[in-house]
């Protein structure tokens, strides 16, 4: 059956729009002009724009530039969109105008047409709400779109990423307590080093994550000042007095986050340094997670031909040709996510540096990469915690064998017999394939009782008490 269309008008003239679509002429032009790739504008960003539209309607009504009836029409439409009733009405590609204008107008048009439908008017009639004159009143894409990126980024970090990160930290904390008396061989340069406990080793992972969490939390402070009320370039043209402060208060109330009106709107409309900074903190979290999963797959490598000090949960077969093979797939998935985050950070850095004069025209890319990064990190942290980290168990036999055979235990003798003699003991033990105690006795440097008293792995970890 052939699709039916209605005719809509905008400043460019007439255009056919699918009869059932709630979007209008400008959205339809964007669908035609930017049929690029398959990445759609994230719904999280759409919902943040809708939050702005609702808050703007409330403030515009309060300041006397929008009547109460139209305010309620806007709020009703925004409520429907926020509840997920119209997700399919936001079909635009990320790869569009660098300001995000088409997406802002997509939201304006859908709100207008929801009101038209609810009031028995034809779609596209702009009655009772005009997309520009009423829904977009006191606003410009140039202040709405970056504000929406900031709001969506803050909400996604607070509601999704930080809770997952906290649970991951808590899981490592439980492992630290459980593993704190398991003494093992430390390794530097991938070679044997002095001993530490498995709990101490895990504490490094935990502290890396805590530092990343703290850095992320701190970066949010730069995202709370909003450019709303700056309109086109930061001067506030066509916005009533006090609109900027009032809308920031409304958004702070609805999001329960301390958003405020930016003192200098020119700066955060022409550049997006705060967003670039937050992206860099996501990258640092990825750097930490990459290091942690690399450690885990090194310590678990084997199970018989490698270190094999940790046993990771076995979740699925690992090879189509080698029976019984199981791979550290959660580590690999996390490593790929982290690699992707680092690449997305590079793109956001370049995008952030690409502004010209009063406008940065890479906003959709920044929005997409930030929200994609937060989503990937949140879900990867959850997956690795549930399917791997909670189930990790130490291989005590392997750990003990490696510790007993480590030549670096000799380090504790250095203050007693000196570096050169200690080196000779290690070399002798290695060359003759004997223990350090046997080499010490052979060279005549210490008796067995003194050796046992001084070369004490537990005391070397600082965990005697």
Swiss-Prot record:
Q: What is this protein called?
A: Fumarate hydratase class II
Q: Which domain of life is it from?
A: Bacteria
Q: Which reaction does it catalyse?
A: (S)-malate = fumarate + H2O
Q: Which family does it belong to?
A: Belongs to the class-II fumarase/aspartase family. Fumarase subfamily.
Species the sequence originates in: Prochlorococcus marinus (strain SARG / CCMP1375 / SS120)
Record NCBIfam families: PRK12273.1 (NF008909)
User: GO CC annotations?
Assistant: cytoplasm
Principal location listed in the UniProt entry: cytoplasm
Kindly tell me the pathway this chain contributes to.
Carbohydrate metabolism; tricarboxylic acid cycle; (S)-malate from fumarate: step 1/1
């Amino acid at each position: 059956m052939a699709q039916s269309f209605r005719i809509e008008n905008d400043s460019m003239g007439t255009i056919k729009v699918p009869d059932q679509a709630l979007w209008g002429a400008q959205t339809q032009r964007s669908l035609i002009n930017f049929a690029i790739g398959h990445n759609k504008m994230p719904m999280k960003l759409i919902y943040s724009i809708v939050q702005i539209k609702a808050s703007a309607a409330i403030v515009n009504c309060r300041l006397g530039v929008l009547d109460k009836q139209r305010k309620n029409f806007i709020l009703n439409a925004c409520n429907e969109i926020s509840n997920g009733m119209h997700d399919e009405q936001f079909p635009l590609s990320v790869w569009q105008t660098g300001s995000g204008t088409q997406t802002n107008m997509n939201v304006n048009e859908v709100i207008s047409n929801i009101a038209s439908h609810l009031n028995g008017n034809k779609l596209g009639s702009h009655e009772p709400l005009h997309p520009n004159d009423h829904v977009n009143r006191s606003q410009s894409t140039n202040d709405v779109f970056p504000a929406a990126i900031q709001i969506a980024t803050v909400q996604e970090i607070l509601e999704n990423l930080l809770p997952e990160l906290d649970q991951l930290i808590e899981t490592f904390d439980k492992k630290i307590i459980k593993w704190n008396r398991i003494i093992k061989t430390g390794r530097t340069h991938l070679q044997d080093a002095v001993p530490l406990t498995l709990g101490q080793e895990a504490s490094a992972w935990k502290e890396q994550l805590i530092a990343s969490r703290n850095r992320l939390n701190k970066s949010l402070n730069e995202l709370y000042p909003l450019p709303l009320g700056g309109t086109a370039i930061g001067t506030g043209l066509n916005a009533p007095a006090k609109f900027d402060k009032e809308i920031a208060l409304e958004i702070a109330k609805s999001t329960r986050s301390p958003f405020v009106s930016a003192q200098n709107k020119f700066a955060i409309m022409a550049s997006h340094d705060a967003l670039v900074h937050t992206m860099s903190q996501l990258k640092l979290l990825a750097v930490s997670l990459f290091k942690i999963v690399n450690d885990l797959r090194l310590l678990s490598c084997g199970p018989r031909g490698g270190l094999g000090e940790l046993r990771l949960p076995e979740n699925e077969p690992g090879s189509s040709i080698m029976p019984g093979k199981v791979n550290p797939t959660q580590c690999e998935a996390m490593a790929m996510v982290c690699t992707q985050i680092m690449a997305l950070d590079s793109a956001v850095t370049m995008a952030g540096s690409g502004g010209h004069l009063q406008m940065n025209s890479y906003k959709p890319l920044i929005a997409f990469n930030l929200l994609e990064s937060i989503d990937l990190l949140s879900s990867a942290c959850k997956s690795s915690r549930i399917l791997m980290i909670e189930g990790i168990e130490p291989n005590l036999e392997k750990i003990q064998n490696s510790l007993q055979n480590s030549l670096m235990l000799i380090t504790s003798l250095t203050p007693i017999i000196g570096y050169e003699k200690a080196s000779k003991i290690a070399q002798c033990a290695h060359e003759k394939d004997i223990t350090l105690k046997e080499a010490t006795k052979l060279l005549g440097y210490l008796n067995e009782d003194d050796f046992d008293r001084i070369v004490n792995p537990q005391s070397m970890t600082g965990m005697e008490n």
